[in-house]
Amino acid sequence: RLKDAGLQSVPGAGAEILTDSVKEIISPKKIDSDDWIRIMKESFELGLPASATMMYGHVETNNDIVEHYDKIAKLQKDLNGFMAFIPWSFEPNNTLMQKEGIVTVGAGGMQLLKMIAISRIIFDGLIDHIQSSWLTNGVGMAQLAIQYGSDDFGGTLIGEEVVSCTGSRSTELTDKRIIDSIKQIDYSAEERDNFYERVSMR
């Protein structure tokens, strides 16, 4: 019904880490891994593409990260519905997990760069676009992420209400700030639409 009403794609949020032992700790009220994958499959079969996300930097292990990558890769090989992959770090400030001492500090910039580089290698030939995650790591780290394998700076946001609650940084960027940040590292800025089709060179 939503597609008939004009829906053209779906978000890939809510994946967190696709390991249920982790999801039970960090997001017990959200759907489990199988349900997330089922929803993505049904969306792809209806012709609705999505992004795939991974939230790292909390209680996950390296094995959990590998399992997450593996599930995303297998689903993409089967149905080819993911337009982009977005790894982003958990920001613990003002969260219950921080108050309970489960997560005390964020993952940091080096971990972001590792995740970007690993994502580019794992999804080579599978998922074309890797997003820089400026929202959780800042503009400077997004510039580095582009040089480590990201090709999507990420968009301007209006009314973001999750990361902004952590008080870590501004959650809005103008298009000029994004363009300037890309040009500062000697890359060309290109505006795209939701489906990664070129709108204009900037």
Model-derived regions: residue spans:
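Conserved non-cysteine loop/helix-boundary elements of the Radical SAM core domain that shape
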Residues: 1-48, 55-78, 97-107, 168-169
